[in-house]
């Protein structure tokens, strides 16, 4: 465990060093297992030709049950290609991500972006409802994993560069570099939704826009993104994801910018190629607790009923321009920022929902 946190701390420290490197810059700020999604302008803009901008980002995203939900969801056995209804009861997930984001200007309008996330994820649920325990109450199971997540490589093109506005189209590809074979505390393979990687390539077109309402004082920004992940080798396909963000930045003094944004995310249901069973219930006595009851042995594409979610959050924050406060080669064009994403509306289909998240 000590080695795991040393590795995470080393990566986070490395990210902070890069974030402070001359040339790192901020213009605005978007936020698994989901991860917080906040819009950071220096990620979305195209760097000047020949210039490398570097962002070091840490985000903390807790997920817990919403009031009025019980967290009972299907169990997914990828080895046997089996979906078992009402087999798990979710408790919590915490995801911490340290991201190194690199942007390089190929031309005045065309840029290259590489995003490298390092993740630490912990998860707890009750496994084997109707199957384990003297009364079918299941078994407490924990999961912890750390490592590189799915990297993203993309290009961006600035189609409308003016003194007061920007419109940037982007297209990225998520590479299956994240861990997909981690086990839980019982030694069983953990389900795809909790692994650090998705195990398959994903496509991610984006659009980013900003306009100075009051030059050098107040600007608005908007971001839209879509992510499609192809079915992986264990028959699992994550649902398509839509992100929409919009907000304002106010320059109070040259070194302090206040920001506020709304963040909306919609994720459709996941799909799993599997047979279908259900957990045993007291009505199945004397075979209770007992093995899951088969409903349909045919392996075919099935919607995972408790996946998919809707999230609307409000994210206040601020950024500090170190170059305006301290004149040195290490602080020139360098900014620090902090954001807190506060949930306003959430629907997670009886599963875990994103809580208040922090990004800096």
Language-model segment annotations:
Residues 21-79, 179, 323-330:
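Outer-membrane beta-barrel biogenesis signature
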Residues 50, 94-98, 137, 141, ...:
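Residues that define the transmembrane beta-barrel architecture of outer-membrane proteins
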Residues 58-64, 116-122, 159, 173-179, ...:
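Transmembrane beta-strands of outer-membrane beta-barrel pores
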Residues 110-114, 153, 163-167, 215-220, ...:
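Repeated loop/turn-to-beta-strand initiation elements of outer-membrane beta-barrel proteins
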């Amino acid at each position: 465990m000590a080695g795991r946190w040393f590795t995470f701390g080393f990566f986070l420290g490395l990210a902070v060093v890069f974030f402070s490197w001359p040339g790192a810059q901020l213009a605005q700020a978007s936020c698994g297992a989901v991860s917080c999604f906040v819009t950071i302008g220096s990620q979305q803009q195209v760097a000047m030709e020949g210039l490398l901008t570097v962002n070091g980002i840490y985000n903390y995203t807790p997920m817990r049950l919403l009031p009025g939900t019980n967290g009972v969801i299907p169990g997914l056995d990828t080895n046997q290609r089996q979906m078992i209804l009402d087999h798990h009861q979710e408790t919590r997930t915490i995801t911490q991500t340290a991201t190194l984001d690199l942007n390089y200007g190929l031309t005045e309008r065309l840029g290259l972006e590489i995003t490298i996330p390092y993740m630490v994820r912990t998860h707890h649920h009750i496994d084997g409802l109707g199957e384990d325990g003297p009364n079918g109450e299941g078994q407490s199971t924990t999961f912890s994993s750390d490592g590189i997540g799915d990297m993203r490589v993309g290009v961006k093109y600035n189609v409308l560069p003016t003194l007061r506005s920007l419109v940037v189209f982007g297209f990225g590809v998520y590479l299956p570099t994240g861990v997909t074979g981690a086990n839980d505390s019982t030694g069983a393979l953990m389900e795809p939704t909790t692994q650090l990687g998705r195990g398959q390539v994903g496509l991610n077109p984006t659009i980013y826009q900003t306009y100075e309402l009051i030059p050098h004082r107040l600007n608005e920004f908007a971001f839209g993104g879509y992510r499609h992940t192809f079915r992986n080798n264990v028959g699992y396909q994550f649902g398509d994801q839509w992100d929409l963000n919009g907000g304002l930045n106010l320059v109070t003094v040259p070194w302090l910018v206040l920001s506020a944004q709304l963040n909306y995310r919609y994720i459709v249901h996941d799909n799993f190629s599997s047979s279908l069973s259900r957990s045993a219930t007291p009505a199945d006595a004397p075979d209770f607790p007992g093995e899951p009851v088969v409903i349909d042995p045919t392996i075919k594409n099935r919607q995972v009923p408790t996946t998919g979610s809707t999230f609307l959050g409000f994210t206040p924050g601020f950024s500090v321009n170190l170059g305006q406060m301290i004149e040195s080669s290490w602080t020139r064009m360098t900014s620090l920022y902090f954001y807190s994403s506060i949930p306003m509306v959430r629907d997670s289909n009886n599963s875990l929902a994103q809580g208040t998240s922090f990004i800096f």
